[in-house]
Amino acid sequence: MKVLGTSVPIFANDLESAIDRYEALTGETVTQRFELPERGIRIALLGSLTIIAGSATGLGVLKDVRATFLVDSLAEYEAHLRATGATVLQGPSQTPAGTNLIVRDLDGVVLEFVEVRG
């Protein structure tokens, strides 16, 4: 059970203008893009940022996520989180990046855990 990386979600009204702003701010460039067309969500990865655009309805609980942890075994993390009292809000679910799980911890913080494909 290991965290392989972390990401901070940035929610934007316009993905392209947000990408321009954050590329200028960080000096980084977008490395990947994903779409969830069934929910009207567009996502861009830029360094340790995940820029997300979509309607409040499409975003659902995702709009409340404060941090994303990339993990080696989502099943192990799910068991650990449940055992320590976290509430599963969504998932495990398949996404373009892999499988994710969204939980609320005991402090009320909403966190996403993702086991990346490949």
Please provide the spans of the model-predicted regions:
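Conserved active-site tyrosine of GNAT-family acetyltransferases
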Residues: 18-23, 81, 108
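Vicinal oxygen chelate
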Residues: 1-3, 10, 31, 84-118
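Conserved short beta-strand elements that form part of the metal-binding/catalytic scaffold
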Residues: 29-64, 110-116
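N-terminal beta-strand motif that seeds the catalytic metal site of vicinal oxygen chelate
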Residues: 1-19, 65-67, 117
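Mid-chain, well-packed structural core segment of small domains
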Residues: 66-81
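Short hydrophobic/aromatic beta-strand element in the GNAT-like acyltransferase core
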Residues: 43, 68, 100-102
